[in-house]
Amino acid sequence: MRKNLLLITILIYGSFLFSQDPEILFNQANDRMKKGELEQADSLLKESLKIDPSFAPAHIGFSELWLRKGDLVKANESATKAVQMDEEFRSWWNGLNDIRTRIQNGKRNVQQGQFDVAMQEYQAIVDKFPYFPEAQFYMGLTKFRHKDIEAAAFYFSEALKIYPGHQKARKGLNNVTKQLLNNGNKAYKRGDLEKASEYYLKAVQFDKTFYLAFYQLGVLEKKMGNSEQAIDYFNKAIKIKPDFHKAWFTLGTSYEVDNNLDSAIVKYNKAIELNPGYTKAYGNLGNIYTLVEVYDSAKDVLLTAIQIDPTYADGHLRLGVVFSQQELFFEASEQFKKATEYDEKNHDAWFRYASSLNSIEKFLEASQAAQKCIDIKTKFGGGWYEKVVAEFGKGNKTMALKYFDEANKYRDWRKLAQRKIDEINNPTKYEK
């Protein structure tokens, strides 16, 4: 029994001594660095220097660690310490000096407009030190100054593949992908959806975390009627940035277009949870509740919307629709009136305002509202129809017949207009 205990003690003690060997810790750190596990390598190198502060290879290890992070100054400091302890490492120090010289040469060549020569200098660094992200960064910067933003994006992204924490490369890539996004947005506004898509796709090709480009791809696909693809892109944007309320909202609109109203409600509520002041989400949510005839819920969310923003014209408009559906035309007219005050160019608001006024027999105001609708959108039968109703209500049969001719031109309003004109011409037919 004593022999067994002694053997176990020897093994444990031997293992402890083995783990305390700075050479072993240094080798473990090198293995970690090659795998990109730089924080673990840092801990192992620190441990080796605790055991033996004069262990020069650990300082070389730190020098390489800093080089992998793109910090040539700190890499040189650690290399200098190693050389002071052991001249054997002078060649490594010289290699760092060569990097510094080539970077200076590259910068000078860029200033002189010799971009190809600068790229050769940086490529020479990459060939010798492929894990040094700063070289890829300078290649990206050279391409950026040469106005080749796609090549710049490639090199910035390569630097980040080597070391994701490289802040200058991250900033450079952000600048480039934002340019691609802006170019895409300009193409989108011009109506060139194919070109816009190309720019957005390039942005996410170089930066798979660029949620705004995924969002814009979703908007584009939605506009083209590709609902499934749009939803996929919106979900990608949300996966990257879960608190992006606009993506939740626009995802909701995609589900609403597909008549998947339950899913749309969930997405709108999520948008509201993330941004309680986002009135558009309340407006769309109220619209769905109106469609499914849950009027109390519709009123609640729409009243909340106009409390948040009393000038939210669409909120007043939709609240007016809720009241109209319940045949509360006076209340509806008050909301439609506010909608026209806050959005004077909305023909639909003027049309609905005229309709509600006709329903409560305020024919003079209804005629004026209908005329506003007609002035804004002449080729809309609804405005002409409400004008017919208003003029007839005022007792102006001649004008009503005149406006009937206009209303009768529009297929969607023809049946109603013809019934109304028959009522004008044959009043006894409609007497109760």
Annotated model-derived regions:
Residues D98, K107, V321, Q325, ...:
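Alpha-helical adaptor scaffolds
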Residues P22-E23, A56-P57, R90, I99, ...:
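Helix-start (N-cap) detector for alpha-helical repeat units in TPR-like alpha-solenoids
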Residues K35-L44, K69-K81, N109-E121, H146-E158, ...:
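Structural signature of tandem alpha-helical TPR/SEL1-like repeats
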Residues L17-K46, K50-D52, A56-P57, R68, ...:
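N-terminal leader/linker segments that initiate helical-solenoid repeat arrays
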Residues N27, G61, G95-L96, Q104, ...:
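Canonical tetratricopeptide repeat
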Residues I51, M85, K128, I162, ...:
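Structural marker of alpha-solenoid helical repeat scaffolds
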Residues N105-R108, R170, N175, Q179-G191, ...:
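Terminal, low-structured helical/coil segments at or just beyond the last alpha-helical repeat
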